[in-house]
Amino acid sequence: MSHKAGFVNIIGNPNVGKSTLMNAMVGEKLSIITSKAQTTRHRIFGIVNDEDYQIVFSDTPGIIKPAYDLQTSMMDFVKSAFSDADILIYMVEIGEKELKDEEFFNKIIHAKIPVLLLLNKIDKSNQEMLEEQVQTWQAKVPNAEIFPISALENFNVKEALNRIVELLPVSPPYYPKDALTDKPERFFVNETIREKILLNYDKEIPYAVEVETEEFIEEEKIIKIRSVIMVERDTQKGIIIGHKGAALKKVGMQARADLELFFDKQI
């Protein structure tokens, strides 16, 4: 049997479950997940390896109309996802309308490559609503194969994965067979801390910070990490730190717990 490999790029509106899907497919938490929009700022590769195939999944930022430079940069990541895909996954959720950007929607319906439309969050619907939604989306995106799924509950995800394997082109692997992602360790430290900031702070604070890991030293039983949280204005420092440092301590404890699971070492 010839080896298969290809790039499978996941696109859709914000908060439809793209990151949850990729994490479920890969079996590791690579993309941060919160209820806030635009939590994915970068394009993240997650790699699934088998003896006969390699799937390189790409989680992209949710599609929006850019209002400032960071959002424009985020949409550039989405544009590149159209250009290098072997298979497109268009992720929608029960009850939503088509993409907020008509240009991207037109690219999907005129795509020359296989398109899988994954209708997510079906655990929030009934059979009648589901059948109606499948018919609606089949009319809107006639070139797509539709898979009703629940990424959170891992329902029908395996069936979608099997179909992806069938559609993969014959190719040698693009990455080493033991690779999980194309991102370095520091990237996941930054993203984990940023996820905890998104979960613990309100209003503009989560979107006004950047995280940079300045030190990552891996020893036999422990990883020593030093990260810096950068804010836009001095007045935001006090909010991040909190009363007697309580807010920042909470972020640190939550991030450390997740990172110890991810790296399987003491942090």
Language-model segment annotations:
Residues E185-I267:
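P-loop NTP-binding site
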Residues P114, D123-T181, E185:
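Canonical P-loop GTPase G-domain recognition
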Residues D59, N120, S150:
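Active-site glycine-centered loops adjacent to acidic/histidine catalytic or metal-binding residues
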Residues M1-F82:
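Conserved G1/Walker A P-loop phosphate-binding module
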Residues T40, I63-K65, K97-E98, S125-N126, ...:
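Catalytic P-loop NTPase motifs of RecA-like helicase/translocase cores
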Residues E28, I47-E51, P66, A81, ...:
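Conserved, well-folded catalytic cores of nucleic-acid-processing
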Residues D52, D76-A144, I217-E219:
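Conserved C-terminal guanine-recognition region of P-loop GTPase G domains, centered on the G4
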Residues G17, N156, A247:
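Conserved glycine(s) of the Walker
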